[in-house]
UniProtKB/Swiss-Prot annotation:
Keywords: Ribonucleoprotein, Ribosomal protein, RNA-binding, rRNA-binding. One of its GO terms (molecular function) is structural constituent of ribosome. Transmembrane segments: none annotated. This is Small ribosomal subunit protein uS8. Part of the 30S ribosomal subunit. Contacts proteins S5 and S12. PROSITE patterns: RIBOSOMAL_S8 (PS00053). It comes from the Bacteria. One of its GO terms (biological process) is translation. Belongs to the universal ribosomal protein uS8 family. InterPro entries: Ribosomal_uS8, Ribosomal_uS8_CS, Ribosomal_uS8_sf. The gene is rpsH. One of the primary rRNA binding proteins, it binds directly to 16S rRNA central domain where it helps coordinate assembly of the platform of the 30S subunit.
């Protein structure tokens, strides 16, 4: 039994990127789908697609690599965990890794990257970081 689908999904993405795989499959959740939408908008993954296999849903993620074959994802980490939730105000999420990285924040306006959350002046739970 898996307790944290987001942590599992991020680990699968990290492992697939280290192995140089083109596509990896994740378990589906609405939150994971929203996180992947942020990754896609920010250019960390090529695309993702929700597929149904009987009564189960999965997400197929196509990873992105540069011209040398290196993954564009250097590091992806879960920040807020089930035992230790991390909440930040909008002032605290302005920049991450001097603008080279992205924090994914769950706000009352939806799941947003840190720069959009700062523009909208909303804080929330920091789900993960990627750069």
């Amino acid at each position: 039994m898996m307790n944290d689908i987001i942590a599992d999904g991020l680990t699968r993405i990290r492992n697939a990127a280290m192995r140089g795989l083109e596509v990896t499959q994740l378990n589906h959740s609405k939150l994971m789908e929203a996180v992947l939408k942020v990754f896609e908008d920010k250019g960390y993954i090529e695309s993702f697609k929700v597929v149904e296999d009987g009564n189960k849903k999965f997400i197929n993620v196509t990873l992105k690599y540069d011209e040398n074959g290196n993954s564009v994802i250097n590091e992806v980490k879960k920040v807020s965990k089930p035992g230790r939730r991390v909440y930040k105000g909008y002032e605290d999420i302005k920049r991450f890794k001097n603008g080279y990285g992205t924090l994914v924040v769950s706000t009352n306006k939806g799941v947003l990257p840190n720069d959009e959350a700062y523009k909208l002046k909303v804080g929330g739970e920091v789900i993960c970081s990627i750069w």
